[in-house]
């Protein structure tokens, strides 16, 4: 029976292990990995590989991994080895990641596109497969004779069932500006993180309110007709979308959205765990990601973006005479927050980078607020409703239509006496 192999790659400095002071708040990657059932209701096996983020370990490793990307290539090869060691024809591949982990699984998908997925008896060639991918010259491009010959001789021809990422940042998942950025580009620029046709379903959760320059969003450009791609904007900064803050009300919205997408494709979750661990709240705390270091070194702010913020649905020049599509839209919870978070001490939620047509919810959806229970949206199988959040959630209800009166008939002359 076909199995599901799931890679869950966490962001920089993120781990599921306890630190001083107890267990760290889990990221969405940790929750996703813990929520996946090992055996489905029909007896299929689901095997999860969790990869902690780069920069874990000694203070030196934290510095090298967080700033310089140390360990990134090793992480990609480790994920690839997990798939090589476990894959059998017919198995489905699911790849999930947050932040630098998102870059990791995107690059992993690029490596599979270039070198294929090695058959188990050729696992000793993983280094060769990575070198072939790393070269990225005309001679070793995925469509080159050498790459095709390598895949045909040693690898499975596989497709990726689902590629899901939370706030994939930076063209390389690394700093992209200044001397350090140029060095990182020269060292890691070979990675292929574009969306190719061998990915069947791709989902990207993006943070509306992030404004740090190194955290430029890496938006997919969709070139494959018929490919299922959604890039959805959520309220919050980087970790409000990918998780890791004590208040997980906002990040759980992005998690529940991703789980629903994966469940619709067949991935099954432990309903008991999800009901305890996932608590969505559109009015959850929006954290300030500008740490003291970022505030002191204001050069990290994004001068290219208005008000230092991200551009949503940014117009892109045509390519080869064809429009470039990104399939971006804003999640419904943002509209809910626009209506809910409007009182002290937080004040109104009004991100200045929302497109004009989205800054105010459509008129037909604004006037009426009803409890979610009165109009609960349909959910994908395998993802139960989360437990009641701290604040009562509200759904936007349609504006009731006003009755239209028939035009009055012209008066008739009274009958003659």
Regions found by a protein language model. Name each.
Residues 1-417:
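Active-site- or binding-pocket-proximal scaffold segments within functional domains
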């Amino acid at each position: 029976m076909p199995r599901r192999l799931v890679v869950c790659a966490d962001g920089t400095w993120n781990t599921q292990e306890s630190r001083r002071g107890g267990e760290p708040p889990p990221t969405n990657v940790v929750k996703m990995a813990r929520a996946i059932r090992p055996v489905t209701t029909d007896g299929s096996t689901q095997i999860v590989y969790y990869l902690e983020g780069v920069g874990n370990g000694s203070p030196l490793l934290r510095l090298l991994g967080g700033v310089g990307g140390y360990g990134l290539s090793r992480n990609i090869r480790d994920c690839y080895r997990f798939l090589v060691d476990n894959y059998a024809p017919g198995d489905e591949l699911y790849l999930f990641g947050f932040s630098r982990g998102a870059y990791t699984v995107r690059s992993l998908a690029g490596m599979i596109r270039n070198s294929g997925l090695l058959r188990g008896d050729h696992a000793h060639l993983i280094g060769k497969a990575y070198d072939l991918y790393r070269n990225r010259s005309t001679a070793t491009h995925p469509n080159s004779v050498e790459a095709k010959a390598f895949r045909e001789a040693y690898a499975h021809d596989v497709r990726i069932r689902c590629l899901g990422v939370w706030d994939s940042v930076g063209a390389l998942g690394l700093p992209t500006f200044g001397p350090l950025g140029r060095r990182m580009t020269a060292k890691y620029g070979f990675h292929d993180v574009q969306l190719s046709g061998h990915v069947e379903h791709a989902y990207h959760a993006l943070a509306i309110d992030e404004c740090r320059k190194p955290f430029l969003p890496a938006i997919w450009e969709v070139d494959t007709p018929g490919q299922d791609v959604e890039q959805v904007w959520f309220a919050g900064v980087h970790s409000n979308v990918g998780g890791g803050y004590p208040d997980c009300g906002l990040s759980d919205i992005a998690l529940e959205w991703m789980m629903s997408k994966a469940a619709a494709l067949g991935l099954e979750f432990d309903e008991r765990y999800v009901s305890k661990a996932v608590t969505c709240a559109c009015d959850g705390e929006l954290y300030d990601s500008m740490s003291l270091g970022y505030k002191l070194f204001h050069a990290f702010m994004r001068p290219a973006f208005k008000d230092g913020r991200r551009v949503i649905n940014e117009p892109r020049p045509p390519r080869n005479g064809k429009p470039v599509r990104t399939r971006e839209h804003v999640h419904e919870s943002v509209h809910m927050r626009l209506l809910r978070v409007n009182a002290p001490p937080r004040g109104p939620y009004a991100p200045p980078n929302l497109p004009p047509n989205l800054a105010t919810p459509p008129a037909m959806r604004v006037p009426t607020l009803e409890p979610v229970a009165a109009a609960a949206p349909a959910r994908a199988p395998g993802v139960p409703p989360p437990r009641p959040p701290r604040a009562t959630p509200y759904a936007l209800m349609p504006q009731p239509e006003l009755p239209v009166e028939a035009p009055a008939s012209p008066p008739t002359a009274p009958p003659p006496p």
